[in-house]
Curated annotation (Swiss-Prot):
The modification Phosphoserine is found at residue 102. Keywords: Isomerase, Magnesium, Metal-binding, Phosphoprotein. This is Phosphoglucosamine mutase. The lineage of its organism: Bacteria, Pseudomonadati, Pseudomonadota, Alphaproteobacteria, Sphingomonadales. Mg(2+) binds at residues 102, 241, 243, 245. The active site is at residue 102. Activated by phosphorylation. Its cofactor is Mg(2+). The keyword Metal-binding applies. The keyword Electron transport does not apply. Binds 1 Mg(2+) ion per subunit. Catalyzes the conversion of glucosamine-6-phosphate to glucosamine-1-phosphate. GO terms for cellular component: cytosol. Belongs to the phosphohexose mutase family.
Length: 445
């Protein structure tokens, strides 16, 4: 069955158009609420959101949907995606909902669903809910309509949980940390957690107004945090995205440390302590060949999946791995969380920094990345990858890189983009290959 609503990371789109309307949000609430009503207990859903203006509308619409089919609603307000997953489990809820479009601009929004175990739903569950969206579902009797309430201590519960990912004797005293919360969901909790652990915290991206989430700040816009690290002579910078499930680090020299380097650090450190499970790390086809070579040199493997943290997590669960992620900064550490958690990952990096006594620039660049280039080509309709000219360009590029590099071409799961990535030891050849394919896609789009 083809997906109409759910993409690679839930439902996402431009507010008040397509799949992202209040009407559809209410129907998602009704469908998901009906799907998860099992047993005779009073059913409950936990709803969190980021700081987008449309979050109010979507939260209200989903609350109406859930309560109309007899499910009680617990409203968390602005909270990171991993906090929703954690609180879904700890509150014994039947499901969790995060209203967010992650790193996208404020005009977009999205819906992510978590099961009672705190994990994102399976493809099968999402497809079943999709089919229910198109049906007229039975509503609750008047006496069985659900109630909605807000809980006031959600922030404190999450802060306690992320601090518990570190041993009790680990403190961050003496570290000057710049944290950029992207004017998003972590604007309160992450600076608070770092401060409680003893760090000197300089926070930016902590003044959300509904329209400035990810706007020139956060893990996809690093100029702001680099400038602040330089200005304050900070030891390290921690950049999160709008829903705080991804992390990019900036060292004291304002050099970028991406998800591949973070996975290399956490993976090898856990392996040295005998705590790494699965014999390696799980990442996607977009992770740099340098990461694979680094892990192999330490007797570890790199398992690759399709792009999307859900696929990384599926492989981690099936193979018994406890470290996985994406180059873009999704870090999944299943010893501590059931989904990507930028704050938990940041604490592991900071703990390593404290114990090593080294500056971040020495600790966090464990391998030299192979030259890699990623370009996005926007298209307005059709399927450009099926064009004969594009297929021929791809075949020619693969022949040029054979044995010397990798080529990954894929449509975005959330935007009308074709992503073209190549890597290899020859940077000029990598650039030529990417440009060749991008030109072919543009002409076919």
């Amino acid at each position: 069955m083809a997906r109409k609503f759910f993409g690679t990371d839930g439902i996402r789109g431009r507010t008040n158009s397509g799949v992202m309307t209040a009407e559809i949000a209410m129907k998602v609430g009704q469908a998901a609420g009906t799907y998860f009503q099992r047993g005779t207990h009073r059913h409950r859903v936990v709803i969190g959101k980021d700081t987008r203006l449309s979050g109010y509308m979507m939260e209200s619409a989903m609350t109406a949907g859930f309560t109309s089919v007899g499910m009680d609603v617990v409203l968390l307000g602005p909270m990171p995606t991993p906090a929703v997953a954690m609180l879904t489990r700890s509150m014994r809820a039947d499901l969790g909902v995060m209203i967010s479009a992650s790193h996208n601009p404020f005009e977009d929004n999205g819906i992510k669903l978590f099961g009672p175990d705190g994990y994102k739903l399976s493809d099968e569950a999402e497809l079943t809910i999709e089919s229910m969206l198109l049906q007229e579902l039975p509503l609750a009797d008047a006496a069985q309509v659900g109630r909605a309430r807000r809980i006031e201590d959600a922030r404190g519960r999450y802060i306690h949980a992320v601090k518990a990912s570190l041993p009790d004797n680990v403190r961050l005293d003496g570290l000057r940390i710049v944290v950029d919360c992207a004017n998003g969901a972590a604007y309160h909790v992450t600076p608070s957690a770092l401060w409680e652990l003893g760090a000197e915290v300089i926070a930016i991206g902590v003044e959300p107004n509904g329209k400035n989430i990810n706007a020139g700040v956060g893990s996809t816009h690093l100029d702001a945090i680099k400038a602040k690290v330089r200005e304050t002579r900070a030891d390290i910078g921690i950049a999160l995205d709008g829903d705080a499930d991804r992390l990019i680090v900036v060292d004291e020299k304002c050099q970028t440390v991406d998800g591949d380097q973070i996975m290399a650090l956490i993976g090898t450190q856990l392996a040295a302590r005998g705590e790494l499970r699965g014999g390696g790390v799980v990442a996607t086809v977009m992770s740099n060949l340098g990461l694979e070579r680094h892990l192999n040199a330490h007797g570890l493997t790199l398992e690759r999946t399709a792009v999307g943290d859900r696929y990384v997590l599926e492989r981690m669960r099936s193979g018994g791995f406890n470290v996985g992620g994406e180059q873009s900064g999704h870090m999944i550490l299943t010893d501590h969380a059931t989904t990507g958690d930028g704050t938990v990952a940041a604490l592991q990096v900071l703990a390593a920094l404290v114990s090593s006594g080294k500056p971040a620039s020495e600790l966090l660049h464990l391998f030299d990345p192979v030259p890699q280039l990623l370009k996005n080509v926007r298209f307005t309709g059709g399927k450009p990858l099926e064009a004969k000219s594009v297929k021929e360009a791809i075949a020619e590029a693969e022949a040029r890189l054979a044995g010397k590099g990798r080529l990954v071409i894929r449509p975005s799961g959330t935007e009308p983009l074709i992503r073209v990535m190549a890597e290899g030891d020859d940077a000029d050849e990598v650039e030529a290959v990417v440009d060749q394919i991008c030109d072919a896609v543009r002409k076919a789009a």
